[in-house]
Amino acid sequence: MEKLTILLLVAAVLMSTQALVERAGENHSKENINFLLKRKRAADRGMWGECKDGLTTCLAPSECCSEDCEGSCTMW
């Protein structure tokens, strides 16, 4: 009976350890996905933030990173 109790305790510890490891893996995957999404969003915003890069159509100079709009943003 004593051996059975020890065996059950060991099994419970192993199962709880496995559950903790699996949860940590899920969080790590979510962190990777969030990191990649943030990088994609930054690339969509343009090199300098919330402005348009060179050769992108614009209506006002404030839309361009270079603050120079002549129908399209100039590079510098």
Swiss-Prot record:
The modification 4-hydroxyproline is found at residue 61. Keywords: Bromination, Disulfide bond, Gamma-carboxyglutamic acid, Hydroxylation, Knottin, Secreted, Signal, Toxin. One of its GO terms (molecular function) is ion channel inhibitor activity. The modification 6'-bromotryptophan is found at residues 48, 76. The modification 4-carboxyglutamate is found at residues 50, 63, 67, 70. Pfam families: Conotoxin. One of its GO terms (cellular component) is extracellular region. It is found in: Secreted. The keyword Cell cycle does not apply. Disulfide bonds join 51-65, 58-69, 64-73. The presence of a 'disulfide through disulfide knot' structurally defines this protein as a knottin. This is Conotoxin Gla(1)-TxVI.
